Amino acid sequence: MIKATKLKKKYDKLKIAKWSFLGILIILFILSNHYYIKHSNIFQNILLTSLTILSTGLIFLTKSGKKFLIFTKSAIHETKLITWPNFKDTLHVTFTVIIVTILLALILWGLDNILIWFISLITSLRL
């Protein structure tokens, strides 16, 4: 029981250290982007890229980062299981959507003209 509490305290300290270091890296990223804007682009790009890689690596060492990595891997696995339609099916669906859209547009246009005619008959505007 005592070992478990010590291990938990050690884990909590490590977790706090990781997130603190990550916060410091983000602050460094913002400050370096602000202060080194007058320096050469190569220096600025190298610094910002290294800070980004370091902070991303540190994020993936945390518990939340590991969960995100597992979620990403399972999402990629699920996309590989999807059966995508072939060209023929895609073409048929596309033409069906186009034809239905044109038919509905013609129906709405006809209803609009009938309503305009009916309203002009009632108000005797005779358009």
From Swiss-Prot:
Molecular function terms from GO: protein transmembrane transporter activity
Stretches of the chain forming a coiled coil according to its record: none
Source domain of life: Bacteria
One GO-annotated biological process of the protein: protein transport by the Sec complex
Gene Ontology CC terms: plasma membrane
Assembly and interaction partners: Component of the Sec protein translocase complex. Heterotrimer consisting of SecY, SecE and SecG subunits. The heterotrimers can form oligomers, although 1 heterotrimer is thought to be able to translocate proteins. Interacts with the ribosome. Interacts with SecDF, and other proteins may be involved. Interacts with SecA.
Classification via NCBIfam families: secE_bact
Annotated PANTHER family: PROTEIN TRANSLOCASE SUBUNIT SECE
Name this protein carries in UniProt: Protein translocase subunit SecE
Gene name tied to this protein: secE
